[in-house]
Amino acid sequence: IANDLINVKKELSRYNIHIIHKPNYGIKLNINELERRIIADLVFASMTQREVFYDFLDTYLDTSDREIIEIIKNNNLYISDLSLADILINYSISIARNMAGHPLDTVFEDFEIFKNTKEYHTVLDLSRIAKEHFDVDFNDSEKSFLTLMLICKGSTHDKIYQEDQITSKLTHTILDDIYSSTLIYIDNRYYDRLSLYIQTALLRQKYQEKIRNPLYDQIQDDMPF
């Protein structure tokens, strides 16, 4: 048992999770609910390489009930197939954890600026589905998490860049570095595209989101350079 526990500790350390020994009470994982969600996502995402996952996804997409897909479509969000699979996984995890009595309690700073986005309105529709089908009420933390996930995983195609100081400064720095190194002047029409790319990249880093999978038919929008 001791050797098995050592191996478990090593495996969990990959996810920055540590075991706390409690005398007379066994062991406890030092981890919050958001970190549990991230690990669950990683575990299920590894199934995308197996036929069983695609069999499940195909079955889901072939059913008459395609409300989730239709909601994303009706809100004009552009998402690759791999990102869509990841969104379905995280949405399912959110529902399952809430049904088990473990809602998300993380406070997402400065979230108010995202409440006027298509992604937030999409999450409001998804919350309605969760309530109707599973009697689950998503709190503000759940809605914030799902909104940020959609923003990070979605394409920047057809989006309008909302100016913010940090992103704009970083964009100008990159363009200046390109010019000083190559004497290539980047046309202003690429400014918003690059700014959107940088903005979502910073969000992914801040909230530990996975790298975005671009839409290849819109690669110039998703990856300007």
Language-model-derived ranges and their functions:
Residues A2-F225:
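A cross-family "folded-core" feature that marks the main globular domain of proteins
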